[in-house]
Design a protein with these regions (language model features):
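Short loop/turn segments that connect beta-strands within beta-propeller blades
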Residues: 44-46, 85-88, 127-130, 169-172, ...
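WD40/WD-repeat beta-propeller blade N-cap
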Residues: 11-18, 53-60, 95-101, 136-143, ...
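Conserved strand-to-loop turn within each blade of WD40 beta-propeller repeats
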Residues: 33-36, 74-77, 116-119, 157-161, ...
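Blade-level signature of beta-propeller repeat domains, shared across WD40, Kelch, NHL, RCC1
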Residues: 273-303
Length: 303
């Protein structure tokens, strides 16, 4: 497979590193959250931005729940702020962590919020009542990332003790626990066909695991530094990895062949760590954000 990469534009406005991205209120919008404590929404058509809200601490994670018109915002002080997007009113603060909230995920199937904390805790709350349902101390390191596999009713959790943990989504029983990386496991992502679990670590490796027995299929030395995010294209044919080594890499999702390296030299990419990526269905744009305070929009097309 051959692809071409075109940079559409760079969006600027945040005053500090950007740590969080999520889909916006419509296909052509995205949300961003930054060290400047501001949530903004960006229009991928006009490239204009709107300030949505500001918060008392650095923003590390966001989760848009369109079904409820809510935006969940995780901050460096361990709080999750619940924002009503209709009136931009902050309606609740969930205080279940004592350190950064690195990831927030919502499951429509369970109607629960799942959070990964820098305090080593993995917490689950009801979205209806915001009550804490369960909290697990997984390790003495940071819990970094969460993903769901609804076909097998499993939750994968990555943490700083190098471990990947697999939980039953209904009972929260731990089903598997295995060393995912030589250094911190930063990101977990089930493939769209849910046959594989992809993980990225501080060791720069992209690891592919067989769902079920979670035996390793492939270990790729993908980056020179930590991998922070993994995103699949809307058609599932491509996947992208984002790294502290300042690059985004595009891979064939079936063969895991490296197709392109997006960097500063070749594509006027990021100056510093690339912290977050999301692949939009709007024009098939790949969106990236990093420590350079920039959001970049990329068009990735087969040749």
């Amino acid at each position: 497979m051959k692809i071409e990469v075109n940079k559409i534009t760079t969006l600027t406005g945040h005053r500090d590193p950007i740590y969080a991205l999520d889909k916006g209120t419509d296909e052509q919008f995205i949300f961003s959250g930054s060290g400047d404590k501001v949530i903004a929404q960006w229009d991928l058509k006009t490239f204009q931005s709107e300030k949505i809200a500001s918060f008392p601490a650095v923003i590390y994670s966001i989760c848009h729940i369109p079904e409820k018109q809510l935006l969940l915002v995780g901050t460096s002080d361990g709080n999750v702020h619940v924002l009503n997007l209709e009136n931009k009113e902050k309606i609740k603060i969930l205080k279940n962590h004592s350190a950064q909230v690195f990831n927030i995920r919502y499951s429509l199937e369970t109607n629960c919020i799942y959070t990964a904390g820098g305090d080593g805790n993995f917490a689950i709350c009801s979205l209806d009542t915001f009550d804490l349902i369960n909290i697990r101390k997984l390790c003495n390191e940071k819990v970094r990332n969460i993903d769901f596999n609804y076909k097998t009713s499993e939750i994968a959790v990555a943490s700083g003790d190098c471990t990947i943990r697999i939980f039953d989504i209904k009972t929260l029983q731990e089903k598997k626990n295995f060393d995912g990386h030589q250094l911190s496991a930063n990101i977990v992502r089930f493939s769209p066909d849910v046959k594989f679990l992809l993980t990225g670590g501080r060791d720069g490796h992209l690891n592919i695991w067989q769902v079920g027995d979670y035996k390793i299929i492939k270990s790729i030395p993908a980056h020179d530094w930590a991998i922070y995010d993994i995103a699949y294209s809307p058609d599932s044919n491509l996947l992208a990895t984002a790294s502290r080594d300042k690059t985004i890499k595009i891979w064939d999702s079936k063969t895991f062949e490296l197709l392109k390296v997006i960097n500063k030299e070749n594509y006027d990419g990021h100056l510093n760590s690339v912290n977050k990526i999301t692949w939009s269905t709007y024009n098939n744009y790949l969106i990236s954000a990093g420590d350079d305070r920039a959001i970049m929009i990329w068009e990735i097309n087969p040749i």
